[in-house]
Every structure is written in C-alpha cells, then in structure tokens.
Amino acid sequence: GHTISNATSTGKKDDNGYATAGIFGWVVSGSVKNLTVDKANFQSTGKGNYSYVGGIAAVAFAASIKNCTVKNSALESKRDYNNNCAGGIAGYSTGATFKNCASVSNNIQSMAYGGSFVGENDDDNDVGNSTYTDCYAVNCSVAAKTEETSGTSFAGGFIGMIVSDIALTNCYAYKQTLSTEGTSASNAATGVFAAY
C-alpha cells in the first residue's frame, strides 16, 4: 500500500457551492484501496451551501473504499452551510462500500454531523445502500457544535447521522470522546455508534 503524510486542504468551493476537503474531494463510482493517511489537516470554513470533509474522501458516492486507514489527523467542517459533515474516512456517503478500513486517533469537528468513520450516511440517491464490512473507529474525538439555534448537532462514535438503511458487518467503535457541548442547536445528540 501507500502512505500520505502531513497533507493539508482548506476546502475550496466549486461552482455549485460545494466545499470539499480530503485526499479526494469526490469519489463517484470509483475506488480507493490500500491507502494510509497520517497526520492530515483538512478544514472547510466560511460560508456557502454544502461542506464535506473526510480523511479519504469528502464525498463517497457509489464508491468503493477498501483497506484504507486514516490516523492522527484533524478533520474540520465549519462552514456556515446547509449541510455540514466531517468523518474520519468520508464526510458524506451515499451508496458506498467500505471494507477493511480504520479511523484511528483522529480529531473530528463539524457544525452539524460528525462521525469517527463517516459524518453522514444518506442513501436516498437511487444508488443503493452503503455497506460497511470489517471496519472500525478507535480513540477518536468527535465534536458537533453550531451557533445556529435552528441547526442540528450530531456526534457519533462511528457515523454521525444515518438517513436510510445501511448494512454493517463486523464493525465497531470504542474509546471515543463525543461532544455537543456549547452548541446552540435545537436538536443535538451523541451516540456510541451513531448519534441519529
């Protein structure tokens, strides 16, 4: 496999108002395998429409991610956006396949949906359900905090928010620090595996 160390990204916004930060911004119907990301610093701040931050992919859309690890990294999605996600492996997943992947000792912050592995899983895009096999998250810190009183703050030990059915096989999360402390959101929650 390959290792990428000390990578940085500040989340450039595209013409459609999406800001993404990660080794890959979007992985659409493609695959990433045998990759380790160590000591990355990925951030998305400012104003716009959508903000996604992930250690491997900001957005995994009908993608295959296998044998990948993200460790010792800082992943922050703090844009004043409609949808705001950060996750150790992917910020946002829809119809993606994850196998033999790990999120280890990462610091993850989001204004809305933060997860040690994936920030938000939403499979309502007609590409099938996301699947997770032999994946884990350990020793990560996840914080979800916003100043918007009408907002939502979810911090999950594996996934921040799950919108639709997913398939999980032999996946686990432990030794996580989860927080929504200081949020002004009217709807806030933490969950050992998923916040919502």
Residue ranges, per PLM feature:
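Predominantly extracellular beta-rich ligand-binding scaffolds that present long acidic/polar faces
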Residues: 1-196
